[in-house]
Amino acid sequence: MYCLQWLLPVLLIPKPLNPALWFSHSMFMGFYLLNFLLERKPCTICALVFLAALFLICYSCWGNCFLYHCSDSPLPESAHDPGVVGT
């Protein structure tokens, strides 16, 4: 389970508040995960645990999924603040 310590922090990286950056963020995270899986070749158990955690986070639609934004979940309150989005 040593290889899992490099995968689990990826789930904790927050999505940007600016909706214009969501595509760039999801592409970066997808390429990072693909590169990690091809280069480090984690064990099967670690890969399955990570994919199960990623599936549960994205399926529950809590807003932490970096693959897509759920249409029924609202934007964060700070996303409407021009001072935050403009940074």
From Swiss-Prot:
Keywords: Apoptosis, Cell cycle, Cytoplasm, Membrane, Nucleus, Transmembrane, Transmembrane helix, Tumor suppressor
Membrane topology: Multi-pass membrane protein
Membrane-spanning intervals of the chain: 19-39, 43-63
One Gene Ontology cellular component annotation held by this UniProt entry: cytoplasm
SMART domains: BC10
UniProt record, GO biological process: apoptotic process
Principal cellular location given in the protein's record: cytoplasm
Subcellular location: Cytoplasm; Nucleus; Membrane
Keyword Secreted set for record: no
Family: Belongs to the BLCAP family.
Subunit structure: Interacts with RB1 (phosphorylated and unphosphorylated). Interacts with STAT3; the interaction is promoted by cell stimulation with IL6 and phosphorylation of STAT3.
Record's function text: Acts as a tumor suppressor; induces growth arrest at G(1)/S checkpoint and apoptosis via RB1-dependent and p53/TP53- and NF-kappa-B-independent mechanisms. Modulates expression of genes involved in the regulation of proliferation, cell cycle and apoptosis.
Protein name: Apoptosis inducing factor BLCAP
UniProt organism field: Macaca fascicularis
Gene name, Swiss-Prot/TrEMBL: BLCAP
